[in-house]
From Swiss-Prot:
InterPro entries: ATPase_NBD, Carb_kinase_FGGY, FGGY_C, FGGY_Carb_Kinase, FGGY_N, Rhamnulokinase
EC numbers for this chain: 2.7.1.5
GO cellular component: cytosol
Disulfide partners: C351-C368
GO molecular function: ATP binding; glycerol kinase activity; rhamnulokinase activity
Pathway: Carbohydrate degradation; L-rhamnose degradation; glycerone phosphate from L-rhamnose: step 2/3
Record-listed ATP binding positions: A10, S11, S12, G13, R14, T256, Q301, G400
GO biological process: rhamnose catabolic process
The reaction(s) this protein catalyses: L-rhamnulose + ATP = L-rhamnulose 1-phosphate + ADP + H(+)
Cofactor(s) needed by this chain: Mg(2+)
Organism: Bacillus subtilis (strain 168)
Enzyme class: transferase
Domain of life: Bacteria
Protein name as annotated: Rhamnulokinase
């Protein structure tokens, strides 16, 4: 059986095929394409038609390789959505979570419901771009015309099959799902002026969505596909592919964002979890991904784009190695870095405000970013141990960031934990494995992780002896200084 993963991230997408051979997963990249938002009509908008076109081109390539039949699963980033009318047509283009319309919405909604009340209901961390805040800022007249609100991966599946669902791992990120009941919360829906029936029925990963409607796409020669729901939130798919064993391990799903957390059976909605802004997102097989959403490779992606010389990410890491780490302390989670006009100038301005050495060269900028990511990761690991009351012995970095040896070593040094890097294509791998579990070719997630360990090289980074406590203290003092400006 051939399985196809459609994995669309915030900056790029890829289509991978995979099959299981003697307990090992063989995967092949078939198609890769760019993704990103553009500034149009006063908003940051996604080009959904571009994504659909690329998906169809990729599926056509699958057939060109001789695969007449396959199953398909789709995952994407979280929180963003489309609004559809009764005919199933989009009422407008999908707005990106990086749009500035929700900059102050957390405070606005707090006039209706307190943070504590929302957290007890949802267990979801407070991010200005969460779906609940996007819907709060929606045009009320547009919402009245809306028949269905669909998360991006659900909408892409709908475009291929005509079947509308709301997959649970992605909708859990909206801050509208009640963590206790597993249903959309009526009070939260009312607070943002939407109705429960505007969402399609909730569904779990591993369900058959429907057959690809080839007749809708006469310009493409497509295989006969059965489309499955997978863990449609890309992080939920990636965590399936985290090669952890038993307990005592944490993960960073490292891409445009860094999601750092542990896998639990039950949510943690304590005051300490709220205070530290941790989230309880749904995972596959009724698990809870207790994690923190941290700014990730977005910052270096923006810097790379703005540098005058054409550096690869590997070259930037090599340049960073030539620079002494921990020369600047920057809170990259500050909302000023979410979508600034110029990331390089924003970093330099932060350093100027806090009277630190200003990074100017490509190597200095890269080293500054990677050093501070490592510090932020280390702080989050310590928080996880405190909140969960469990020690973390192993730390798995999965996703694109796993190939960054420089950052991986800094993370090991700052956390004092052994870092295990890989697999790199964790999200697509988890997508494929979820399809295999649904097809009963793989028994469960435990067996899926054994398949990962059998199939992919895992690189180990051991921590060096550094004065990590002093570095973290300096970071925290500088961050407090910046907040007082």
């Amino acid at each position: 059986m051939i399985y196809t993963a459609i994995d669309v991230g915030a900056s790029s997408g890829r289509i991978m095929v995979g099959e299981l051979n003697e307990g090992k997963l063989d995967i092949q990249e078939i198609h890769r394409f760019a993704n990103g938002f553009s500034q149009r009509d006063g908003h940051c908008l996604w080009d959904i038609d571009h994504l659909l076109k690329q998906i169809l081109q990729g599926l056509q390539k699958v057939k060109t390789l001789g695969y007449e039949h396959c199953t398909v699963g789709i995952d994407t980033w979280a929180v963003d959505y489309v609004l559809l009318d009764e005919k199933g047509d989009r009422l407008r283009e999908a707005i990106s979570y990086r749009d500035r319309r929700t900059d102050h919405t957390i405070d606005k909604l707090e006039h209706t419901l307190s943070k504590a009340a929302i957290y007890q209901k949802t267990g979801i961390q407070f991010q200005p771009f969460n779906t609940i805040y996007q819907l709060f800022e929606e045009d009320r007249e547009l919402l009245k015309k809306t028949d269905k609100i669909m998360m991006i991966p659900d909408y892409l599946g709908y475009c291929l099959t005509g079947k509308a669902v709301t997959e649970i791992t992605n909708v859990s990120t909206t801050q509208l799902l009640n963590v206790s009941t597993g249903n959309l919360d009526p009070e939260l829906l009312e607070a943002v002026s939407v109705l429960e029936q505007q969402f399609a029925p909730l569904t779990e990963p591993g369900c058959e969505l429907g057959k690809l409607r080839n007749e809708w796409f006469p310009d493409y020669d497509l295989p006969a596909c059965k489309v499955m729901t997978v863990a449609t939130h890309d992080t939920a798919s990636a965590v399936i592919a985290a090669p952890g064993v038993n307990d005592g391990w944490a993960y960073i799903s490292s891409g445009t964002w860094s999601l750092i957390g542990v896998e639990n059976k039950t949510p943690i909605i304590t005051d300490l979890a709220l205070e530290n802004n941790y989230t309880n997102e749904r995972g596959a097989n009724n698990t809870i991904r207790f994690l923190k959403n941290i700014i990730g490779m977005w910052v270096i992606q923006e810097v790379k784009q703005q540098l005058q010389a054409d550096y690869s990410f590997q070259q930037l890491a090599e340049e960073a190695k030539k620079t002494e780490p921990f020369q600047q302390f920057i809170n990259l989670n500050d909302k000023r870095f979410l979508n600034p006009e110029n990331m390089i100038k924003e970093i330099q301005h932060y350093c100027r405000q806090t009277r630190q050495k200003i990074p100017r060269t490509a190597g200095e900028l890269a080293c500054c970013i990677y050093s501070n990511l490592a510090i932020i990761y280390a702080i989050a690991i310590k928080e996880l141990e405190t909140i969960t009351e469990k020690p973390i012995e192993q730390f798995h970095i999965i996703g694109g960031g796993a190939r960054n040896d420089f950052l991986n070593q800094l993370t090991a040094d700052m956390s004092g934990k052994a870092v295990y890097a890989g697999p790199i294509e964790a999200t697509a791998t988890g997508n494929l494995l979820m399809q295999m579990i649904a097809a009963k070719e793989v028994k469960d997630i435990k067996e899926a992780r054994q398949v990962v360990r059998n199939s992919f090289p895992i690189k180990v980074f051991t921590p060096k002896d550094i004065d990590r406590s002093t570095i973290i203290q300096s970071f925290q003092q500088t961050v407090l200084k910046a907040l007082s400006k």
